Amino acid sequence: MSKRNYHSIFLIFGIMLFIAPHSFSQSKALSVGAVAPMFTAKASQAGNEFDFSLKKALTKGPVVLYFYPAAYTGGCDLEAHTFADLKDQFTAAGATIIGVSADDIQRLRSFSSNPEYCAGKFPVASDPEGEIAATYGLKLKPPQPGVKDVRGEQVTHGFIPRTTFVIDKNHKIVAVFSSETDHIAPDEHVKKSLAIVKGL
């Protein structure tokens, strides 16, 4: 799928998701300089389920923790595809990538292995109640009736605002990017994160 198509789907989904902003309260994400909350979560990489530990990942180097609304939706698909495309550069910088959404682990097993999206190159974790997101100051937005993913399936879970945290090996947040407040496209989260980890 071309990037033009990804952007078109993202725009349609964005309109659907944010057409009733009065029903959502904006999140106030943790700021640069804050200590990143540790967590362990069910995750999948290349279709294989495992327990992801942020603390363990940080022993290897910086971590790019990105929250996204839903697998198999335009903007999130573009973001995952871009992370997969640039994965070798993140690895060269010593960085780990972990995506987190409210999708259940079954959806993430498929999403993580799909060659159009994560392509098995990095893990995505399940936060169905938004508990991990809450520790980072992000509020889980309620499910929206009628929202379907790119496969035509109903999206029944809530949505975590698209927000990326770059965390250094000392557990400090060194960068935060939010589509809500910074108004940046999904693939820009990836490019900005890569620029940061290359400088650490």
Where are these regions (language model features)?
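Bacterial N-terminal signal peptides
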Residues: 9-21
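Chalcogenol-based redox active-site neighborhoods
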Residues: 24-200
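Bacterial N-terminal signal peptides that target proteins for export
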Residues: 1-11
